[in-house]
Every structure is written in structure tokens, then in C-alpha cells.
Amino acid sequence: MVALSVFVRQQPKLSNLSFVTFSEFFSSIITAQRASYWGAFFIAVLSPGFLLGVTQPSHTHSVQNPIGTATLEIGTCDSNGLAGGTCYRAVVSGCPEASSDFAATVKINEPADLNSLKGTVFFTTGGSGQALYDYDQDFIGDSRCSASNCGLMTVQSINAANYRTVQVDFVDPEGVIQEPDGWLTGPATDGPRSLACRYATIVHAVWEVLLKRDKTHLVCATGNSGGGALLAYAITQYGMGNGSGPGPEFTMIETTSGPPYGRIDQGCAGTAAPVSTVSCPPGAQLSEDYGLTTAADFVDPAYSSDVCTVDINSNGTDPYPYFHHDSVLSDDDPAPSYKTFVRSLFGSEDLTAAVPLGLEWYNAITSSKSAACVTGAPHELPEDFDGASTIVTDITTTCK
């Protein structure tokens, strides 16, 4: 194997530093079991070295999250999905709050005519991202797509339009590193927000090493549900939407069916979660409540304990204190503005909390954006022929 290493790492600014003893203490507090949280807190404030009279926990956050480092090793693609690709094993290290290295598969397909290259498009799948877009079982089933694989149709059509396609699968291709929950494998104090560092680092590594920091051609991306959340975190918390991050700066992203982490604090609030009237499907009233299954599968694994499940069972009376901060629409950026054009798609058959939670973020964006409703499309929007066709049209007409 040929190893290509990326040594560029964005460092937090000095202005984000605080009193270390105090910060480290409370970072450890919020990783403890929730049942012992306040007991540990009151013991601490009565102990030597801590100030008396403090009544609220504190945790130091950076407005912009730093990325880690990555290596890319050339591997072998399997026979599924789009033929002619080159696959890499990406190993990410140094992401703050991630306790160990993380590995993922990166599959790249060059267009037939590189001289007519229009740009590069990244693809991520939903949930914990443990599949390539061109062979995700959730995107297979609509007979109107070739081989009933609409994910493959999407990638293939965009590649045929002279775009380089880059797919990310958050599973170690060598099976060495155990990642049961894909990119959401924790624990992390700041949950999905911190763990999205893995995606941002991989995107940067591909751009830095393989694309040679190419600023001549555009970089765009699409992702469904949790995969769309990775794009939203990248342009918001990792600076890839306004030039403040390590690069690249996305020209356009298309989130489909989300992002479901628009407001985690509201998604984990149980019956206290807001109910919104949405336009897709027209006039439907949808709760932002994740429900216990989604909480257990796609929120709790990012933390050190079942914090979302606990909050749902309490109907919002026992919240994890940093859910709002950990959201895409966070308390440190309530009115996001990007140089990146944001396009959001929803399906009329999607009645999940991802719709109103995704709209929480979309509606707060103050920069250039647009949204659309795909009639008949489910939450797994790229599984639907019309949904997949809309993605292809949007990217090939907007990413240019």
C-alpha cells in the first residue's frame, strides 16, 4: 500500500482557552453518569482548589471546531457500485474528544474526460454513514432506477456529467478498528458536533493530498439525513462554508431529509418537543421528538451515556446541558451565514422528526439558499427515482 499523509492541522485560537483546572474538571463531570452529576458537582465546589459559590457547571467551547490529521492508503474497491473507482483507507487521528484513531473507506471515480472536469462532489449516506452511496441498501428498491439502485444512478449520472465523485463509508475497510456506530462512535463530550471532525478531516485530506488544494475546480457535496448533518457541521462548525476553516470551501451542498441534528435539545425533549407545521408534506404537523429508537441508535452512541434516552423519558425535564451547543443550529451561531449555497430537499412521505429539525437550521440561515419538496419520496430520499433525479439535476446545474 502507498501511504499519503496529511499533516495540516487547524489549532484552536488562544482566545478560546480558559482556566485549565476548572475546565478540565467540568469536562469530566459531564462525561459521568447523569445520576451522579449534581452529587459530584457539589462535592467538587466544597473541595480545595475550587471556588465556593459556583452554582452552574461550565464547559469551554470553541465557536469553530478544529480538525484532526489523516493518512490515505490506496486499497482495493469491491465489485459493488460504480466501476472504475480507486479506494483508500483513511485513518483519522487527533480529533478533539475522540479517544482513538478512526478509519473509513474513501472511493473516488474520475470522470471520463478529466480535461473537462467541472468539480468534485462528496457523497455521504444516512444514519451513522456505514455504506457507500452507490451501494447503500437503503437506496435500493425503486425499479425505475437501473438495477433498482437509485444511489448508484445518482453517483453515476453526476460522474458522467464530468464531476469527480468522492464517496465516504465510515467503516474500517480492513476491520482493524471497531466502529460499531460509524462516525457516531463515541464517546464525545460534544456528541455529533465533535465527531463530525472525522468527516471534515477526511474531506480536507482528499482536497489537500489528492486534489493538491485545487481551487480552480468547485467542491460540492450531498448527504442524506445524518450524512446531511455532516455537511451542515462542516460548513458551520468547521469553517468549510465561509473560508475560515482549513479548506476546502464548499461551493454548494445539498442536504436531503435533514439535518436531524438541527436542534438536538428539542429532538431529545420527548413530549415537550415542539410541533411544527411544515410545507413538505403540505400542512403536516410534525413533532421534533426523535423517539426512543432514534435516540438509542443515532444520538446516545455519540455520548458517554444514554443522555437523549434519559431526556426523552423525562419529557425534557432532565436535559444534557450542552445539547443546544452540540446542534448544527447551535447557541454560538444562531443565525448562520455562508459563502456556500445551501440546497435542502425533503420528501413528502417523510414524517420523521428530521424534517422539522432540518428546517430549524434551514430557516435560520441568512445567506443564499433554496429548498424543495419531492412528491412521493421517503426519508431515504435517494432511494426514490424522482428524489435521485432531483439531486442529479440540482448538483449538475448549481455546482458550476
State the predicted function of each range.
Residues 63-116:
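N-terminal cap/lid segment of alpha/beta-hydrolase-fold proteins
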Residues 111-158:
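Short, surface-exposed "cap/lid" segments of acyl-processing enzymes
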Residues 120, 159-169:
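A fold-wide structural signal in alpha/beta-hydrolase
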Residues 165-194:
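Cap/lid segment of the alpha/beta-hydrolase catalytic domain
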Residues 187-213:
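Alpha/beta-hydrolase active-site loop
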Residues 216-276:
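Primarily recognizes the serine-hydrolase "nucleophile elbow" in alpha/beta-hydrolase
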Residues 295-375:
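Serine-hydrolase catalytic core
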Residues 384-400:
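Catalytic active-site module of serine/aspartate enzymes centered on a nucleophile-bearing elbow/loop
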